[in-house]
């Protein structure tokens, strides 16, 4: 499995019994599965009392690493030997490997359904709209307020024939960067089709 260095480091830290005891590891692993599989899950999955003693930044890093590995394992439909090999490479002991495998088996079907619902192709942008975001002035002189833009991309999902919208907010520089990248992508596609 090819994971980024950041994810690998976070995942290897989960193997350290000094950082995460067995109970904490199990709670974090269940929280990772819950945040992936439960649409209503939010940051409250990490609010368990036994996880309060861990620095929130460290906790979120390990949680993200575990969730990324779970998704990658599900995407590749990893079997027990594949999981064990990778976990051993990350210095997991046999107890943690068994805990991971048990949790993975319990959630495997739901994970495969989730991954299957995502689709196999990227959404196609069909339209874009933008507007200036409203700014409220305050009496704070130390902050400089710059215009922000609300951008809405209308997309078409060819797998599900749905037409969802993707909305985000950005500042002037980010908007210019987005427009530049879209122009570059358009030129690259034109060149590719002319070959």
Curated annotation (Swiss-Prot):
GO cellular component terms attached to this protein's record:
cytoplasm; nucleus
| Record keywords | Cytoplasm, Ion transport, Nucleus, Sodium, Sodium transport, Transcription, Transcription regulation, Transport, Ubl conjugation pathway
Main location group: cytoplasm
Amino-acid biosynthesis as a keyword of this entry, yes or no, is: no
Single GO BP term: sodium ion transport
The listed locations are: Cytoplasm; Nucleus
Q: Name one Pfam family in it.
A: COMM_domain
Q: Which residues form the COMM domain?
A: 124-193
- What's the domain of life for this entry? Eukaryota
Report the coiled-coil segments: none
Could you tell me what this protein does?
Scaffold protein in the commander complex that is essential for endosomal recycling of transmembrane cargos; the commander complex is composed of the CCC subcomplex and the retriever subcomplex. May modulate activity of cullin-RING E3 ubiquitin ligase (CRL) complexes. May down-regulate activation of NF-kappa-B. Modulates Na(+) transport in epithelial cells by regulation of apical cell surface expression of amiloride-sensitive sodium channel (ENaC) subunits.
Q: Which family does it belong to?
A: Belongs to the COMM domain-containing protein 3 family.
Summarize subunit and interaction data from the UniProt record for this chain. Answer: Component of the commander complex consisting of the CCC subcomplex and the retriever subcomplex. Component of the CCC (COMMD/CCDC22/CCDC93) subcomplex consisting of COMMD1, COMMD2, COMMD3, COMMD4, COMMD5, COMMD6, COMMD7, COMMD8, COMMD9, COMMD10, CCDC22 and CCDC93; within the complex forms a heterodimer with COMMD2. Interacts with NFKB1/p105. Interacts with CCDC22, CCDC93, SCNN1B, CUL3, CUL4A, CUL4B, CUL5.
Q: What is this protein called?
A: COMM domain-containing protein 3
Q: Which organism is it from?
A: Bos taurus
The organism's lineage is: Eukaryota, Metazoa, Chordata, Craniata, Vertebrata
């Amino acid at each position: 499995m090819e994971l980024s260095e950041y994810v690998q480091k976070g995942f290897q830290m989960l193997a350290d019994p000094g950082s995460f005891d067995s109970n904490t590891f199990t709670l974090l692993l269940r929280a990772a599965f819950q945040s992936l599989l439960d649409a209503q899950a939010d940051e409250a999955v990490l609010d368990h009392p036994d996880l309060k003693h861990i620095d929130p930044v460290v906790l979120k890093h390990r949680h993200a690493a575990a969730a990324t590995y779970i998704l990658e394992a599900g995407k590749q439909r990893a079997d027990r030997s594949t999981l064990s090999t990778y976990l051993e490479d990350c210095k997991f002991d046999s107890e943690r490997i068994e805990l991971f495998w048990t949790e993975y088996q319990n959630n495997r079907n739901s994970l495969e359904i989730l991954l299957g619902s995502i689709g196999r192709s990227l959404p196609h942008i069909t339209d874009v709209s933008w507007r200036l975001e409203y700014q409220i002035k305050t009496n704070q002189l130390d902050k400089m307020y710059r215009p922000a833009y609300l951008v809405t991309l209308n997309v078409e999902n060819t797998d599900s024939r749905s037409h969802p919208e993707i909305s985000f907010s950005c500042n002037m520089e980010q908007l210019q960067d987005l427009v530049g990248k879209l122009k570059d992508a358009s030129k690259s596609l034109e060149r590719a089709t002319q070959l």
